Amino acid sequence: MAITAKHLSKSFDNDLHDVIELFMQMGHMAAEQVMVATRALIAADEATAKKVIKDDHLINQLEIKIDEQIILLVAKRQPAANDLRLVMALSKGIVDFERVGDEAEKIARMACQLIEDGASPRGYSEVQHLSNQVRLMLLDAIDAFSNMNPQQAFSVLQSDTAVNEEYQSATRALMTYIMEDSRHVSKVINILWVLRALERVGDHARNIAELVIFCTSGKDVRHTDFMQVEQIVQQTTDAGIIHTDNK
């Protein structure tokens, strides 16, 4: 399902297309930052970690640029209900992407700290695995938004549950290790902060997925029972209702 339908105003189509293109660019940039920061941590690559920290401002600048374009779009075009819902989702989504960039920066800073203090004896395999999972979640959420695919968005919500469980399991294991051997407490705690940052990336991917369901069903599914969300997605899919389209 296309993210937008054609409108009578070609200039509106062009303006909206420009915003969506920047939105996708920002999302992919944020996902890339998470991957690069994690690689820098595991490889003890200080130069790459510092580049992630330095490049965070690029994501911030994109957020400001998209915000400005959204404000102009609303002021000039006064979008109707269906299009306004999409514009609202874009506005909310860039906040999540900006925060993903912030989490990548935190991971990079922890990488620099661990390089300075010496490697942690535990936790790197957990970081690698969780990083792979949340990056795929984020990319799937971006793809679901691009295609306005509520089923794919719901799969992201399911993945978030698995990520949360893995995060909790890894945290318990590392806390047990600290209690049994306190010689490397500060280093392991830095790894715990990295795991926390990755778990938050998963939460932001979930938020993007919820925006897809909002756009396609017209229902705000934040803080909604999981089974109820599944029903909404199924009903939307069965009925062929995609609320971002102007019929």
Per-segment meaning from a language model:
Residues 1-247:
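Cytosolic, long alpha-helical scaffolding segments
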